[in-house]
Amino acid sequence: MQIIEISEPGASDQSEQSDEIVVGIDFGTTNSLIAVSNNHKAEIIKMSGGLELLPSIINIIDGKVTVGKTDASKNIIRSVKRLLAKSSEDIINNTTLSSLSDMLVLGESTPKISLRGTEISLPEMAAEVFKVLKSNAELALGSSVQKAVVSVPAYFDDSARGQVLFAAKLAGFEVIRLIAEPTAAAYAYGLQNNTEGTYLVYDLGGGTFDVSILNMQLGVLQVVATGGDNMLGGDDIDMLLVEYLSALSGLKVSTDLIARAKGVKEELSFKSEVIFDGNII
């Protein structure tokens, strides 16, 4: 297995290659994953059950924090990444996040969520996702995994980036580099190796829309500018569809309707129309 070393520009070359594994982590709004480089290709490490993606969902089941599992209860936390560096006021006043208002522990200097009697901070919730990724990687690789490169939204400010670093640290990771998600996508496809010019690369995820303007010359990738919106992504498209289907059918907004709306969206990816409660969509 190839170990990729990432160093700062201008740093002296290391004569000896480290035998320590460095993993890449995509901490996503909807799903997260972890990978290693194997023969110059990214190899995604599968979670228990054989799935590559870990839903970024926090739940409390029988008094224990769980990740990626849901049940019929509404008391689960989705899209953890959207909450990072947000104040209680930010969460209450944001229409997308305000559904969590009843779970907020008010009076705290930093926001905490009370989930089935357990209070947990926002970085601690993110750390639970990192812990599951780490344990699965160590099980698959048969080795301790400490170092990681983590992708973050291009628009993340220092506070949000700091909370990602803190969450990873709580999980036992040493983050050697944060990389903007569109930039990571460009590297993943090796664009800098066979492409020259200035390009706009976008990443439309579950909860964020990011863009980076990249200049690629002679195998070197330079980030010219970045931007994005952390309230524009697949989750928001889902909710717009939920509201539309609710108005069309008279059904109340519920977890069941959200699941059905996602099914409609996915079907429309390969069909021109879908029947929903007798209506053509």
Residue ranges and their predicted role:
Residues 1-98, 104-109, 114, 118-119, ...:
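Oxyanion-binding/catalytic loops of NTP- or PPi-dependent enzymes
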